[in-house]
Amino acid sequence: MAASSSGEKEKERMGGVSGMTGLGSTRERLLSALEDLEVLSRELIEMLAISRNQKLLQLEEENQVLELLIHRDGDFQELMKLALNQGKVHHEMQALEKEVEKRDSDIQQLQKQLKEAEQILATAVYQAKEKLKSIEKARKGAISSEEIIKYAHRISASNAVCAPLTWVPGDPRRPYPTDLEMRSGLLGQMNNPSTSGVNGHLPGDALAAGRLPDVLAPQYPWQSNDMSVNMLPPNHSTDFLLEPPGHNKENEDDVEVMSTDSSSSSSDSD
């Protein structure tokens, strides 16, 4: 009787537990079903052991415990199927999460490329607006084609793209000497022995005239007097260089009279 009463109490407890199993998650329900199966199996084994030792038949109680065990096993199998389905769904969710991460990475890459393209387009639009402003400004201050052609002809005629620092309107000089100017210069005459002025000497006619050749002509007005004086030939006589101080015509007459007297006295002595 004690065994039967304990079995009834166990059944009531198992019934209460089985009623509470529908409230939790699948994992909790599986654990609860396993605990119920463990308790029922232990109870059934104890009942079989007691009946064998006492040689008492308790078929009704054993059948009830066995039915509960079979019922809980069915619940456990259903929960296992549910868990397997949920496991498949979980794997699908993980695969979808990986796909979402991949798509998110692709979207971020595309977003980065779109930002770069936006920056490039913004720069291009800004430059285009600046060009349009320049075009509009050029249209407002347009220059006739004839003036442009004249200016281009003037540049091409001078064979130059940059004028000297001292260049003024009307100055025909170029920023560099031409081949003809180089040949007619001092260096060209030094390299050519057939011309006068070889070995660095100036032509005789230029020295005799007291002037400089065109190659050595001063470029500035303040240089003309100094360079003319410095470049005079050695045999060129000037009053301010060769005549001593106080020299005049009367001194010359006195010298001539003295020379005449000395010559006459020498003739008388003879």
From Swiss-Prot:
The keyword Ubl conjugation does not apply. Residues 1-22, 227-270 are annotated as: Disordered. GO terms for cellular component: core mediator complex; mediator complex; nucleus. The modification Phosphoserine is found at residue 32. The modification N-acetylalanine is found at residue 2. The keyword DNA repair does not apply. One of its GO terms (molecular function) is transcription coregulator activity. Residues 26-131 form a coiled coil. Its main location: nucleus. It holds the Pfam family Med4. InterPro entries: Mediator_Med4. It is found in: Nucleus. One of its GO terms (biological process) is positive regulation of transcription initiation by RNA polymerase II. Keywords: Acetylation, Activator, Coiled coil, Nucleus, Phosphoprotein, Transcription, Transcription regulation. Residues 259-270 have a biased composition (Low complexity). PANTHER family: MEDIATOR OF RNA POLYMERASE II TRANSCRIPTION SUBUNIT 4 (PTHR13208:SF2). Component of the Mediator complex, which is composed of MED1, MED4, MED6, MED7, MED8, MED9, MED10, MED11, MED12, MED13, MED13L, MED14, MED15, MED16, MED17, MED18, MED19, MED20, MED21, MED22, MED23, MED24, MED25, MED26, MED27, MED29, MED30, MED31, CCNC, CDK8 and CDC2L6/CDK11. The MED12, MED13, CCNC and CDK8 subunits form a distinct module termed the CDK8 module. Mediator containing the CDK8 module is less active than Mediator lacking this module in supporting transcriptional activation. Belongs to the Mediator complex subunit 4 family. Component of the Mediator complex, a coactivator involved in the regulated transcription of nearly all RNA polymerase II-dependent genes. Mediator functions as a bridge to convey information from gene-specific regulatory proteins to the basal RNA polymerase II transcription machinery. Mediator is recruited to promoters by direct interactions with regulatory proteins and serves as a scaffold for the assembly of a functional preinitiation complex with RNA polymerase II and the general transcription factors. This is Mediator of RNA polymerase II transcription subunit 4. The gene is Med4.
